[in-house]
């Protein structure tokens, strides 16, 4: 993709049109109005161009007061807390300072005539497209931009923020995008940028065909609307971004257990048989999914009517599954088959996206031999209309259509797809498909999330969905899984990177299809186990794919190892709940890439498939056959959870893991609350959830909020451990002098 600079008008000169408590409006030489607003310490908004089209509520934060000062020659300064935004004119450019040091600024790549190679701020002469360019220091990494399956560091890449059914995890295409990126900076502070738009954004992140020393954004919308962030750390940037775009909601405890699924259970009797077998084989599990073709007639879906041939009595069928202490997840997508009775009904109400002529827009799936994703198991999907969630009536209708499903016994919805809005579709709110496309899955999942909140039987637990597509704001409606990975080792590695990249984009929850979704052959037992072991440490865990994915399908030895690691997963739930509480408060993900957890450490950040689970556990997934993996240990000291051996940090460790072992390390100074090995979360006693407290070396951090254990700081700066009589404290490392006090509960 080339960048035609001659097509752009550069913005320059800044003349005051007025100031306010939170910013200023400035006139430019092109006649465009450049508006600057403060959104609290560390966050500034730069907006130029008209704002006549829907913004879809992507931003929930509000402007806040800041100090505004006008200098000479059209210069301006805006200060909030420790962060200052400086603007200069001719040409228009910015500099962002944090604690007095510059952390980000406009492009410095100059043409030999003295102009910058690309506009620092510019628009296409005919309007409707904008660009902005920022300077990058040599070697400065950039992260985020949604769920991307390639390298986490986007430096050198041309990245498109465009939601698409990626049909796998092997390309730059992705189901979940967010035009939000950040850099740990060069030692003076971190910075971030969010492009506030539902439209397509192209990011040239040190892309050499444009400028290897610049980060260039190209926005296909009527206005350029940017938010700039500055903070001490990348965690601070994510905190600012999620303050602005919405904090993640919490999730129910049962959702942290195992989800079992396949494409697909042919009959409810087969699903009930699997449910019984899970209990007979002592496989811990909480949710069973009736996937795409398991509940509905393919020819009429989705009409919210059970297939009458297979589900003559749906409540009885679901009760047979739920009798095994399982929740039920049911698949849907936001499309209506053209021959369904619902099609004419919804069309007559204006509840469907239309063509320019006002007819319902009919979407056809690719059925071309050689390119179609469909086959013998996953048969072609029917031509369908697309529900228009911008229509208030359609939104309410779709939400309330779920009532009967939840009354029948459904607990949660797998809200699949949502990536298919065509550019030339027309929405009720006046937008075209080009602008609606990216935010459509956000509106769709919001609707299903609200349906769950309204109709679920457990009124005292948080609602959730199991969604695939997303955009900025999707963190408000958890959770999303990583789509359809290929069943091989590269599919595993890419799925891990996708989850970490989504987490670096301000979304704390992620899962993937253990074993992979598709492939020319079924996953090997080794691949299945390594995928499962890695996903034990993600926020959510599900086995799924075309064909059997239940542990017993891979042999008795594999089943035994899977059972062991699933038991460990359930024991982790008290810890995961603490990590999730932090996610809700700050936006930090459960799975934390090395560049996010240790942003200043150049050794570890290049290891892009290892991650922190919360702040206490280092996870180094095995992503190749044979069990060998290199582990880059961050600073400090680390305890192998298998051998209990202590390893000094800031080194690379070559690790060989037997099939029943997995490289996980506890961080010295931290503690790990461990629960019981149960068969489902309903067996967890909320008054006594802990069985053990694992302490890695001498504690250096407090642990509070648990009923049965704590670590508190004494007046002399040391930390004391307390535990109830029924909680065993496991001390890793030298325990000399460490005293454990008994708590009364």
Residue ranges and their predicted role:
Residues 89-91, 173-175, 188, 219-221, ...:
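Short, solvent-exposed loop/turn segments at the edges of secondary structure
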Residues 51, 57, 281-562, 597-599:
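Aromatic- and carboxylate-enriched substrate-binding clefts and catalytic-loop regions
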Residues 30-31, 72-73, 79-81, 90, ...:
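Short, well-ordered loop/turn elements at secondary-structure boundaries
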Residues 1-245, 249-255, 260-263, 268-276, ...:
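N-terminal accessory segment at the very beginning of proteins
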Residues 156-159, 174-177, 272, 395, ...:
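Short, hydrophobic/amphipathic alpha-helical packing segments
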Residues 92, 185-187, 198-200, 233, ...:
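Short, glycine-/Ser/Thr-/acidic-enriched flexible segments
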Residues 450-455, 463, 470-480, 491-494, ...:
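Catalytic core of carbohydrate-active enzymes
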